[in-house]
Amino acid sequence: MDEGVNTYEQLRVEGRENPNAGLLKDLAKSKQAVSALGLENLPASALNQLPYQVMASRGLDQPVQGPTAGQYGKGNYGVIVYYKTAALLRYLAGYLGQEKFDDAMRAYYTKWQFRHPYPEDMEAVFEESTGQKLDWFFREMLTNTREYNADIFATQTIGDQVKVLVRTDSPVLWPVPVSTVDAQGKVLQTLWTPPFGNPEDDAESQLNFRKENVAAVVVDAEYLTPQLNRRDDRLALGDGNFRRWEPVRVQPLASVERWDRSAINWMPVIGANTSDKFMLGAAFYNGLLAPKSCSTWPCPCTASAGTSSTASPRST
């Protein structure tokens, strides 16, 4: 874990000068790339999770703790040991609060400087410093490759409060950050659930927010958690069948998972056969960077022979 701790601290220091500090900081400098990939207004935490999400969505994820250096797959050593670990530590800091996290890190350094501690030693110091049980993080999240997911199950407005019911299908405990946002998507208030989860069924937790200026409630608005699916993270207040509707943008090549909008990607395609000769068209798809369990690639094409056209859909 030492590489991941170093990466976490490095990103914090670099972030003071560059808000986009991280693995893809050069990408964020290009306005063309930012627009093409739909990265506008995304925090660095979202970009730093992208390499891990690419691997995990293809079934190539590995635990932070457990494998030896030689047991990590091709490309996974840097992605998992450095950046996944750093991202999970940022998530823990969000849950504990930055001040409590920093106090625990100082206590850890003071006790174990010039020695070789193990993850259980770090857990013991953090639990003593914060007064909280953190086995859900050190013994579960760092040692497994589970796909964590949570959504907003229901909201109820009573007086000047918005009561929010958060749901997770995780079989193990984990805390979930939930935020209220205004009509422009600005975060108004963020609260964390206690660690919750159930191996037998969905688990639920209730949070109470201030009502003023709230347009929607969002799971993980700051992209701290290791979720892969962001499509069910937002629920607008009010009634109707479109409370989970997100704006859809058509973008070339690829896009990242966001809670505030969906994307349909496209790329040019060419083909040929004996009947239609040369064909030119476009493929439309979603989830190239983080593939879904079910996806469809419709490919409308125009043939050079005659005026007919053909479509070649592909589903997986």
Residue ranges and their predicted role:
Residues 207-209, 220-316:
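Outer-membrane beta-barrel initiation region
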Residues 170-173, 211-212, 275:
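Short proline/glycine-enriched turn/loop motifs at strand-loop junctions of beta-rich domains
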Residues 188-198:
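Solvent-exposed serine/threonine-rich low-complexity stretches and specific carbohydrate-binding patches
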